[in-house]
């Protein structure tokens, strides 16, 4: 049964970063999943999370774009900044309305300076490359990030949606503290190569969309209530031809959660937590009650037999549809050219 609990602390990676064992993904507070939440309500939710022990806050310069960081900046005033571990990201540019993945040194530096200004902070705790620029050797991008650490603008470096080979190459330039990847009961392809690579190198794992973008919270009926500007409407797994298949997975998880005395969302989150103390899920929400429910997932204990049952339920064939549309870059197409090919412009 899921009970109220204290949010424990974990070491993320092996460079000294300590975070709450569950974070808060802030993307949905300023759109993407429908309309933005009113600013006062969004700030109240962030403050409630921090007061509850969820101090690891995740944002990005492309959420909004930019408005999410501005919101966080307002929420962190009056001494709140010192209570949190702040993570943001760079690498997806929307200049002139066109999306472009960028990782050249000049862009890395400009993006960091802009994020510092929007967040109204002097240093970012964890700075991720949101998507990998496959035109720029990862060593070049990492070199500029290393300089930002030396200058005190960021404390730790992270990668998001990076392949195992890209992670290895990046790690030779400067230790990677965390890799952010989608990991949930319906997204498990990272278990084959990326998770073992992170563990070999002492890199923490941050799981985004641990509830399957809300699927394990609401099930297939979620689709009926999506706003027209909710980007999930375009995702393959939420298309009706795939949803009819995917709802079977939800029904099995729901039945198991009922026996367990928790919600399907809590069971799905507990499964991620049980992957190890080097894993930190960052579920997002716009409702305080859902935030409280997510925190209670930390109290759900799963036996080895229950973990095995869940993993049997959540085999790859139980999920139909890709994670993203074909145009969205992921770790599967994130390898970069060799360093020897680089000629700075």
Swiss-Prot record:
Keywords in alphabetical order: NADP, Oxidoreductase
GO cellular component, one term: plasma membrane
SUPFAM superfamilies, A to Z: NAD(P)-linked oxidoreductase
Molecular function terms, GO-annotated: oxidoreductase activity
Highest taxon above the source species: Eukaryota
Name this protein carries in UniProt: Probable aldo-keto reductase 3
Binding of substrate, residues: 130
Species, as recorded: Arabidopsis thaliana (Mouse-ear cress)
Chain sites annotated for binding NADP(+): 209-219
Keyword Oxidoreductase attributed: yes
InterPro entries (alphabetical): Aldo-Keto_reductase, NADP_OxRdtase_dom, NADP_OxRdtase_dom_sf
Active site: 63
